[in-house]
């Protein structure tokens, strides 16, 4: 399956990660508001409701209680488009106020950063005002990130992961890698590394 197709769809990404036994947050898919509410209560509050497609944390909401969940599900149910009728519900992972973005090129990690949420938000996207800090690549992070990248088809990818009591969990893999936040804190020249990788692949 095409890498961009897999990475552009959280459902496909999750299915591949779980099949390959790459650690990922507990996720339940539902196709009606009623079954989605049951899924949320199975995972427990708080939980996270995400769109199947999209980036930058858009339409990703934290469901703190049943009342909030019912309101968000009702709103989603009124939106047009078949993809909005797929309810992608994920556990709210107990983690520090950050996640990890690793930039993977083939079989190695170019760089890794912590991404911290901006004040008043829990989402860590740099595009939403979050900020980055350098992250040491541990053996666990390297193993999980490279396995995740290989699972979706490999290449130049951004693997997003969280630290949890169960270890490193991959929650997203991006085939369009934004590295402005990483470039501002990492000593490595990420742009040059990416160019070198692309040229090397083009010569094959």
What are these model-predicted stretches?
Residues 102-104, 167-181:
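A short beta-strand motif that forms the metal-chelation/ATP-contact edge
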């Amino acid at each position: 399956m095409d890498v961009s197709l897999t990475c552009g769809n959280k459902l496909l990404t999750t299915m591949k990660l779980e099949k390959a036994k790459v650690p990922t947050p507990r996720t339940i898919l539902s196709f009606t508001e009623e079954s989605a509410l049951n899924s949320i209560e199975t995972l427990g509050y708080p939980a996270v409701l995400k769109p199947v497609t999209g980036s930058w944390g858009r339409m990703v909401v934290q469901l703190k209680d049943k009342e909030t969940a019912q309101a968000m599900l009702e709103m989603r149910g009124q939106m047009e488009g078949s993809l909005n009728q797929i309810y992608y519900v994920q556990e709210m992972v107990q983690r520090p106020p950050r996640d990890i973005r690793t930039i993977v090129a083939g079989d190695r990690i170019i760089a890794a950063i912590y991404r911290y949420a901006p004040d008043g938000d829990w989402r860590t996207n740099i595009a939403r005002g979050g900020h980055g800090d350098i992250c040491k690549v541990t053996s666990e992070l390297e193993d999980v990130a490279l396995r995740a990248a290989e699972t979706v088809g490999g290449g130049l990818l951004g693997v997003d992961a969280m630290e949890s009591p169960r270890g490193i969990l991959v929650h997203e893999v991006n085939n369009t890698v934004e590295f402005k936040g990483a470039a501002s804190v990492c000593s490595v020249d990420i742009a040059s590394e990416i160019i070198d990788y692309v040229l090397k692949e083009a010569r094959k």
